[in-house]
Amino acid sequence: MRAHGLRRVLLCLLRLLGVVWTLPNSLMGLLLGICVIPWGARPRLSRSDFALVFDRWPWGPGGAMTLGNVIINTAADLEALCPTYAHRAGLCQEPRVRIGSHERAHVWQYMLLGPFFLPLYFVLGGISVRNPLERAADRYALGQGSWWPWQNSIK
């Protein structure tokens, strides 16, 4: 029982460290979200997605975007289903995924990479099927693997 309690404390501390590490990214997301509240964006905390979510983002083609522990979402909630990047690119047939699960993977990626996430994201291919961060988020949302793109390379 004692080891379980210690493990919970360590996980809590690691999460807190991740939140602090990615705080510059989260502040950008917070500023972005607050700016569009007058146009209909609705903020809420999502414990399951470990993020502050701004639903009903009024602009853009649809979908969601994560900045640190902030998710900007064009839908009414994160339950909306979307195609994976590989499916959209015509590489395979996959079921649609819950957008919140995909974005949660990015939250965890941000918490590990902190201020390096955005530069690395664009170096790895940006918003595309080539980006291993996006492919890992899709696998995670499909329930087929870790949110960490290089999980299999760590042995």
Regions found by a protein language model. Name each.
Residues 1, 152-155:
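Low-complexity, intrinsically disordered extramembrane tails and loops of integral membrane proteins
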Residues 1-9:
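Short, Lys/Arg-rich, polar N-terminal cytosolic tail immediately upstream
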Residues 11-14, 18, 22, 26, ...:
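A structural signal for well-ordered alpha-helical segments within the folded catalytic domains
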Residues 12, 18-74, 143-149:
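Auxiliary, metal-adjacent structural segments of Zn-dependent hydrolase domains
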Residues 64, 73-101:
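Short pre-active-site segment immediately N-terminal to the catalytic Zn-binding motif
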Residues 69, 106, 137:
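Divalent metal-coordination and catalytic microenvironments
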Residues 86, 94, 109-139, 150-153:
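Post-HEXXH active-site segment of zinc metalloproteases
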Residues 99, 103-111:
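Catalytic glutamate of the conserved HExxH
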